[in-house]
């Protein structure tokens, strides 16, 4: 029997909290998969198509407003109830056109904004725990997308079943998150970040300028790797046919720095493996033939290239997280940095899809 204060329970709660953190991005992904088409675009479908970059931008703003976060943390149950209601309504009307149910696009935008506190709240709690717990959290985030990829492959998106995992992630994830907050490891992590009596606040916190002073080198390397990723991906999209028609299946890379960092280690030695590997993969994507079978191989190599670059950026994220581990607000800062990277990558992939799609 697994006790609620055991390490197994902590891993399970962390995994389910990861699925909860994925819900605002899954919400955008669902509407993009159902209603966004490359062949024709209207004002409404454009909202769904660009919803993920806008969600990243809104999340960055929320990371910079800790007062708003504290207020929203007390209302997570109400947000969950509203989101479940919105999902049920959208599932009920998913077979109708927007002319008959014109409120659906507005409901999509409103619910996306309502779900934004979940990634911030879960990250703030989970990253007070030991590093192994972080892996389960990121695995849960990635696993939630894998479920929807499987549903897309099975072509069940025209059924109401397509919305069911989203509701399960919401309700189950929130219940797990509330248990996670009370876990002994999370409380111990909070205690380690208590300020001594000469500090002005209850917990140790860093300003943006203090964080920059501690992590200047890591941030510079992260930005350099991000620019290299953007330039390389642009070359793949504009010079090869690899990304044509793959937009919906590339959505995981829109949030890659929130879901793929778990494969990284906090050691720069890993870069001596990841970066040459990425260079080889990028070269193969460009030089291989253009036959149907070879195009599939090139698409897989492109995905591996992106995973390698995300893992390389994840090395710097892990180093930043280690340097800022004493601060209670370090998870918000790291989340903001990851979201900036995701915003750049998602904007680039969206533009490429519009240009070559």
From Swiss-Prot:
It holds the Pfam family Herpes_BMRF2. It is found in: Virion membrane; Host cell membrane. GO terms for cellular component: host cell plasma membrane; membrane; virion membrane. Keywords: Host cell membrane, Host membrane, Membrane, Transmembrane, Transmembrane helix, Virion. Its main location: virion. The chain crosses the membrane at residues 20-40, 44-64, 78-98, 101-121, 132-152, 157-177, 219-239, 242-262, 270-290, 300-320, 333-353. It is a multi-pass membrane protein. Participates in rearrangement of cellular actin to increase intercellular contacts and thereby promotes virus cell-to-cell spreadin$g. Belongs to the herpesviridae BMRF2 family. This is Protein ORF58.
């Amino acid at each position: 029997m697994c006790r609620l204060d055991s390490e197994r329970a902590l891993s399970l709660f962390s995994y389910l909290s990861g699925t909860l953190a994925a819900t605002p991005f899954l919400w955008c992904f669902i509407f993009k998969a159902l209603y966004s088409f490359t062949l024709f675009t209207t004002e409404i479908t454009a909202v769904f198509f660009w919803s993920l970059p806008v969600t990243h931008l809104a999340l960055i703003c929320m990371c910079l407003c800790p007062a708003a976060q504290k207020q929203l943390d007390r209302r997570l149950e109400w947000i969950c109830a509203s989101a479940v209601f919105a999902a049920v309504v959208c599932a009920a009307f998913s077979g109708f056109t927007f002319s008959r149910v014109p409120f659906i696009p507005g409901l999509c935008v409103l619910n996306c904004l309502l779900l934004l506190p979940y990634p911030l709240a879960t990250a703030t709690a989970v990253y007070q725990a030991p590093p192994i717990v972080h892996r389960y959290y990121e695995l849960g985030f990635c696993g939630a997308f894998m479920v929807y990829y499987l549903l897309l492959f099975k072509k069940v998106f025209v059924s109401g079943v397509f919305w069911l995992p989203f509701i399960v992630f919401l309700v189950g994830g929130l219940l797990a998150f509330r248990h996670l907050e009370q876990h002994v490891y999370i409380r111990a992590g909070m205690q380690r970040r208590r300020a001594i009596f000469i500090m002005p606040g209850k917990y140790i916190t860093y300003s943006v300028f203090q964080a920059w002073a501690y992590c200047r080198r890591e941030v510079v390397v992260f930005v350099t790797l991000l620019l290299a990723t953007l330039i390389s991906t642009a070359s793949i999209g504009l010079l090869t046919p690899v990304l044509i028609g793959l937009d919906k299946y590339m959505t995981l890379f829109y949030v890659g720095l929130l879901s793929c960092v778990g494969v990284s280690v906090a050691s720069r030695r890993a870069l001596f493996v990841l970066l040459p590997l990425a260079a080889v993969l990028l070269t193969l994507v460009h030089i291989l033939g253009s036959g149907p079978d070879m195009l599939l191989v090139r698409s897989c190599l492109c995905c591996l290239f992106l995973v390698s670059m995300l893992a390389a950026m994840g090395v710097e994220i892990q180093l930043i997280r280690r340097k800022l581990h004493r601060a209670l607000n370090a998870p918000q800062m790291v989340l903001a940095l990851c979201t900036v990277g995701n915003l750049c990558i998602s904007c680039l992939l969206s533009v490429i899809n519009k240009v070559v799609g």
